[in-house]
Amino acid sequence: MKKILTVAVTGCTLLLASGAVLAQAKPDVLVKQRQAAMTLIGKYFGPMGGMAQGKVPYNAEVVARNAGFLEALSKMPWDGFAPGTQEIKSRALPAVFSDTAKFKEAGDRLQAEAAKLASVSKGGDEAAIKAQIGAVGKACGGCHETFRAKQ
């Protein structure tokens, strides 16, 4: 019982400390973190998109692995859009900060579709997996059209 309590207290302390660190993070650091998360999302989603489009041979093991990474990564960038980060040069459009409800919906949609892909990828149904890859791509693209500046 003592061990469980120690683990619980330690976990809560780390959770609170990580929140405090995030709250104190400088805007430029937050922007770099969100950009890194988005880069990794692209890295792990890209091959799956290629498979869904028939440009790359389908590989169920790669899809399952990448879908798991994508599910975790889809949760990471959003804290990087904190107040104050709009002053840092990036491709985030002003709408990210002025229409926060719509932006949050878009982020939530990506997370939900990525979670579905991670689940579907374990089933082995190639057609269902490719359809879900398309749904993830649509979630990504929908956000990019509204909230990201063109290069």
Each model region followed by its residue ranges:
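Bacterial N-terminal signal peptides that target proteins for export
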Residues: M1-V9
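N-terminal signal peptide c-region/cleavage motif recognized by signal peptidases
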Residues: A17-A20
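Sequence context surrounding c-type heme c attachment/ligation sites in exported
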Residues: D28-A60, N66-Q151
